[in-house]
Structure formats: C-alpha cells, structure tokens
Amino acid sequence: VRPADRHNRGMETPALLDTLLRTPGPSGYERDAARVWREAAGFAEITTDGLGGSIATIGDDEGAPLVAVVGHIDEIGLVVTHIDEKGFLYFEPIGGWDPQILVGQRVTVTGNEGSVPGVAGRKPIHLLDPEQRKKVVKLKEMHIDIGADDREASQALVSVGDPVVIDAEPMAVASGRLVSRSMDNRLGSYVALEALRRCHEDSKMKARFAAVAAVQEEIGLFGSRTAAFTVRPDLAVAIDVTHATDAPGVDEKEVGSHPFGSGPVIGRGSTLSPKVYELLRDTAEAAGISYSVGASGNATHTDADSLQISRTGIPTGLVSIPLRYMHSPVEMVDLADVEATVELIRAFVNGLEPGVDLSR
C-alpha cells in the first residue's frame, strides 16, 4: 500500500488500485491495464476473450452456482485522427467528454515506442472575439501539442490511431478520499479482483467465482457481452460508479441520496434481478455494511444492461461506488466506500449456496 497523507484519516491506497489508476487504458486500448490486472490475479485460473476481456476464476465444484462479478477496465480517452504539417495532433473522443475539461490539460499519447507527453491547446482567450468567449469550446477547435517542429518530427513519435489520456496521477486528499483519472472504472475492476482474492484466502465459498475485467464499456457495453458468453455464469453483478450526491449541483431528487461514506449503492429497478438485489441487500444488512439503494426505471447504462440480456438471460445485480466529478481527470472517491464494496462482494459470494433461487 501507499501511505496516505496526514489528513487522510488513516486510509491507504491499495497498491493494485494505484497501479491500475496510473496505467493508460482507454476503450479499445486496454491492453496495458488488463495486463496489470491479470498479473495480480496469478492465484486464479486466468482466461481472456477475443475482445480483450480478462477473466479470473476460482472454485472447481461444477455443481455449484457460478457468479460473475464484472468491472470494466476501460476509461474515456482520445484517439489521434490527424497530424498536420506543423506537427500538431488532432483527435476524436473515446467515450463521453465535457470538452471544456480538456483545455490546458497535460496529456500522454501512447506512441510508437512508448509514452509521449503533450498538452491540449486551443486559441488563447486573448485572441477570441467577444462572441467566441461566450461559447463552449468544441473538440474540433482543439489540438494536442507534443512540441514537435513539423509533421515528420511528430510522426517519428506518434501515429494516427494512437490513444491519448489526460496526465493525472492519483492524489490523496483529506478525509480518506482519493483523486485520479480513470476511477470510472478501474474501481470496478479492482473491486472484482480484490473480492476474488479475499474469497480465495477465506476458502469459505460454496459457489464458483469469476472476476471479470471487461473492455469497451464506455463505447457501448461491448466487453461484458462477450465475457458473459465466455464465462456462462448463473448470475452476475456489475460493479461501477455512480454520482456522489454530496457535491454541489447534484440533485438528490434526480439520483437519490448516495453521499461519501454511505457505502456501496445497490441497484434496484426494471432491468435488474429482484432476487440478486435481495441477496445483496440481505448480505449487507447481515454483515453490518452501510449501503444505499439506487433505483432506475430504465437502462442503468452500465455493464448490467448487457449482462442481463446475454445468452438466455442472466440474473444480474448492480453495485455502484459514489464518485464525484465523473468523466474528468479529478474523479474523487472515498476509500472507505471502496473497501465496503469489496467486503460486500466478498460476503455475497461466500454466502451463495447451491440451489439458490434466482427465478424472477
């Protein structure tokens, strides 16, 4: 673990989570982050699917229920689409961006032979006319400057199609909170694997457990769909993030009440299995784990949506971690909520019995 600062309420950032957060891995370019995840899963049986998803499985009783706990490992990013004659890079988004966030950010391009630093720039405010200053910047008005003199110099370092992420390393702040890019959703992939590790050490399981680091969630929930066909689970739980409601501007009437320190958010709604919800809720209450309930009348816009309609239908639950400033380089989480989520999944899996009723 990495020591937290003196304001950090004794919480420490787990070493695996820290490494995952630092490793670039936008949707479709998750290879390096997935490699970190698989290396940490050496105690389990490891497989991959054709899309790049990673699966770590424990338990060998073929008659026991198989639960898949899925956290997508991809993050939002950018992809280089053009290099002009002056060596500047132009790009398209990978996933959903607020363009204003990108202005003036340091970035890292995964280039021909490694990481290439640069900055995201636009016309300086001094040169904008009054009408331009009133408008939200568009991505097509921005560029990336890696310091190269011309196209040839840039092409020696990067190529069209190379991925880009904002250069923002994890930072511990007060009250046991952690700030980083890629919390959405390295947190989910971390929780799935850490719960798997603890269940492996407990040796209490009566079920089989597959932790999944799914890919390409941010561009269409694709990786969880292929992983479901590979794993063929009897039930599944998606782990993702949701909006923490104790930040300014977040309306609890719209998203419910999920402040920092309230623990995991257990999903309930139209597309989620009532039985899996009840099992998660009962597990939290029996274990004394604080939680809140997040309701959805439509799609959840998480991997739970693709999991529950895979194959002939998979009873699926959703557990989310409250997060501030989603889809930004300063996503913030309370580490106590992360730990509580790991413990919920650990207790949930350890409590699954053969013959569990999952009927709807």
Residue ranges and their predicted role:
Residues 1-360:
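N-terminal hydrophobic/helix-forming segments and targeting peptides
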